[in-house]
From Swiss-Prot:
Gene Ontology molecular functions: DNA binding
Subunit structure comment from the entry: Heterodimer with ARID3A. Interacts with unphosphorylated RB1.
Cell location: Nucleus
Name listed for the protein in its UniProt record: AT-rich interactive domain-containing protein 3B
Gene source species: Mus musculus (Mouse)
UniProt lineage: Eukaryota, Metazoa, Chordata, Craniata, Vertebrata
Gene: Arid3b
Length: 568
């Protein structure tokens, strides 16, 4: 019995102690739970306010910043520890507490668990969104007056604008530059664009104020409105030679001259440059003015005055390009203009005549004329046929190549001066053709023909005088590809200055001899028959060298062939 009584007494002594312990635990837990609930409610209440403060945030981002990830003072953990400590003696006592106490403790535990789960859920969300702004300092702290809270909120607003001084471990530090790059980068570009815009507006203002012409403002307004409606607005004023290009004056000058196409065809851009007061040292001023006019003013010209069409403009530009690539006519032949060609031809003929009369050889060859081998017809009967001069080849670009004097020339067997009197004077004929209204290309080709004809005559007149000075061989009608095998051939070789070794091949018979020069003008009398040759030899009064036939004659004997004489 005694042990039972002792147990009952102990239980009675412990029973008044248990309500005291429960009351102490409740008194300790009450303010802590209220504090945790107040903190959680304040967090939930600040969420819409933060969302309204940061409108640029995405909808799914968290509003709590990196500093909110650190639990403030962890009251929930302390309460759980105290509840565990307080529950240990209750479990040891065998659960003799009253039902009301158990219900209260269970409700408190459930609320604490819910608060803790929601708190840790918010912590996970903030970890997933690292760009959250540090707003934990905006949470109200119990124990502070409303004025203190307001001052603290003001400080936190200033702090939120400045970068955090000490970033938390594992959290990125967000500086002011990065925030400007992400959210305020447009402000910098707007400022730069604003500077350029102010510059452009100043250019427009200067364009309006270049002079006091009352039509300037009306024209510029109409031009800008037209280009805006056309879909190609003028966003900037062109600059030329470090000054604003006066669009009004450019349009006025061009339209007064007949329009853009007319100026391109006439090539009078220099007058436009002077009218705009631009320096004459500008390179490619014509091209620059043309491109600027086409870009800013040509459509307006077509709309208002219709001086030309885009097709005509393109044709004018293409023609200008072709003329730019084409070489000038003054340098195509002799380096001087075609108008002076007649005078040059006359000078060449006079030089040839003076050289022939004075006995001095003159090589009249233009350095840029191509000479063709002259073909000659065979002489038949007593009359000599006129020389056959092949038509001159057409003059093309690049034909003016210097040609050396050929060592073998085909010349006429009769005097060139005799045939020169039978046809009209080349200079008069050339002058008539130049004075006629022919295109320059045809004039150039005809000029080349006349020049070649004059030079051929000069060579015929000075044949033997050149042979005396130059060691050369001249073969007359000696082309191997001739269809007439009976054509006479003449080979001349200079042995010294005063004599010429001559070899004539007539109808297969070769005649050789030495010619001694006595007169500068050579009269070459050649007959097709031995009788004509003999008569010419008998009529000769001057001293002559008789040509003896070669032993390789294919017709007759040397004694049967009469001797031929050449009068010098």
């Amino acid at each position: 019995m005694e042990p039972l009584q002792q147990q009952q007494q102990q239980q009675q002594q412990k029973q008044p102690q248990q309500p005291l312990l429960q009351m102490d635990a409740r008194e300790k837990q009450g303010p802590q739970t209220r504090e945790s609930q107040f903190l959680y409610a304040s967090k939930l209440g600040t969420q819409p306010a933060l969302l309204s403060i940061t409108p640029g945030r995405p909808s799914g981002s968290s509003v709590l910043g990196p500093l909110a990830r650190v639990p403030p003072a962890t009251p929930v953990a302390r309460m759980s520890e105290q509840s565990n400590v307080n529950s240990e003696p209750e479990e040891e006592e065998g659960g003799l507490e009253d039902e009301d106490g158990d219900d209260d403790v269970a409700e408190v535990a459930e609320k604490e668990a819910q608060a803790a789960s929601k708190y840790f859920h918010m912590q996970k969300v903030t970890r997933q969104e690292p760009r959250a702004t540090p707003m934990s300092s905006l949470l109200p702290v119990p124990g502070l007056s409303p004025q203190g809270q307001q001052t603290k909120e003001d400080h936190t607003k200033d702090a939120s604008k400045a970068p955090p001084s000490v970033p938390t471990a594992g959290q990125p530090s967000w500086s002011l530059d990065e925030q400007l790059k992400q959210n305020g980068a447009l402000a910098w570009s707007d400022d730069a664009d604003g500077g350029r815009g102010r510059e452009i507006s100043r250019d427009f203002a200067k364009l309006y104020e270049l002079d006091g012409d009352p039509e300037r403002k009306e024209f510029l307004d109409d031009l800008f409105i037209f280009m805006q409606k056309r879909g190609t607005p003028i966003n900037r004023i062109p600059i030329m030679a470090k000054q604003i290009l006066d669009l009004y004056m450019l349009y006025k000058l061009v339209t007064e001259k007949g329009g853009l196409v007319e100026i391109i065809n006439k090539k009078i851009w220099r007058e436009i440059t002077k009218g705009l007061n631009l320096p004459t040292s500008i390179t490619s001023a014509a091209f620059t003015l043309r491109t600027q006019y086409m870009k800013y003013l040509y459509a307006y010209e077509c709309e208002k005055k219709a001086l030309s069409s885009p097709a005509e403009l393109q044709a004018a530009i293409d023609g200008n390009r072709r003329e730019g690539r084409r070489p000038s006519y003054s340098s195509s032949l002799f380096g001087y203009s075609p108008a002076a060609a007649a005078a040059a031809a006359a000078a060449a003929a006079a030089a040839a005549a003076s050289a022939a009369s004075a006995g001095t050889p003159a090589l009249l060859s233009s350095p840029k004329i191509r000479f063709s081998i002259l073909g000659l017809g065979s002489s038949s009967g007593t009359s000599a046929s006129s020389p056959r001069i092949p038509p001159a080849s057409t003059l093309r670009k690049g034909d003016g190549v210097p040609v050396p004097v050929p060592n073998r020339l085909a010349v006429s067997g009769t005097l060139a001066g005799q045939q020169a009197g039978n046809r009209p004077g080349p200079l008069e004929h050339l002058r008539e053709r130049l004075e006629s209204g022919e295109p320059p290309e045809k004039k150039a080709s005809r000029l080349s023909e006349e020049e070649q004809r004059l030079v051929q005559q000069a060579f015929q007149r000075n044949l033997f005088s050149m042979a005396r000075q130059l060691p050369m061989k001249i073969r007359i009608n000696g082309r191997e590809d001739r269809a007439e095998p009976s054509a006479p051939a003449l080979n001349l070789t200079t042995s010294n200055i005063g004599s010429i070794n001559m070899s004539v091949d007539i109808d297969g018979t070769t005649y050789t001899g030495v010619l001694f020069a006595q007169k500068p003008v050579v009269h070459l009398i050649a007959g097709s028959t031995p009788q004509s040759i003999g008569s010419s030899a008998s009529s000769s009064n001057s001293s002559s060298s008789h040509c003896s036939p070669s032993p390789t004659s294919s017709r007759g004997t040397p004694s049967a062939e009469p001797s031929t004489s050449w009068s010098l």
